[in-house]
């Protein structure tokens, strides 16, 4: 966002904080464990601790809202940010082959699984590394 968005868009969200819920859109899949879903508050724009570069830190699946502004305004801003992030200019495509491994840094990248491998199967293991608090 820092390089592609105008000054006005950056200024509008630079100090905003989001509510981030682990189960987010997937919460209804298992109501029994709802009380244990972790919540966190993160900045909309975070600074990568190694590179120092700025990155959007919102996600359709887990970001519920921008705090301290009306919900309709939050929804509109988030919709704009999600559409911005989904621009093909910001995407990397991975072509799976036998024994492929994909690894990315969630501090500056997101993934979106495409169900494009029918009739084949694809399996994966999620590895989460305990990291820093986004700033």
Protein language model annotation of sequence segments:
Residues 1-101, 106-135:
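Non-heme Fe(II) oxygenase catalytic core, chiefly the N-lobe of the double-stranded beta-helix
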């Amino acid at each position: 966002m820092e390089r592609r968005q105008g000054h006005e868009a950056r200024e509008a969200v630079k100090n905003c904080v989001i509510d981030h819920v682990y189960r987010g859109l997937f919460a209804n899949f298992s109501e029994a464990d709802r009380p244990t879903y972790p919540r966190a508050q993160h900045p909309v724009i975070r600074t990568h601790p190694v590179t120092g570069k700025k990155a959007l830190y919102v996600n359709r699946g887990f970001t519920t809202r921008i705090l301290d502004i009306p919900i309709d305004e939050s929804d509109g801003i988030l919709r704009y940010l999600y559409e911005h992030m989904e621009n093909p200019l910001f995407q990397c495509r991975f072509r799976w082959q036998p024994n492929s491994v994909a690894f990315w840094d969630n501090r500056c990248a997101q993934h979106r699984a495409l169900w494009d491998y029918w009739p084949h199967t694809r399996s994966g293991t999620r590895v989460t590394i305990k990291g820093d608090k986004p700033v």
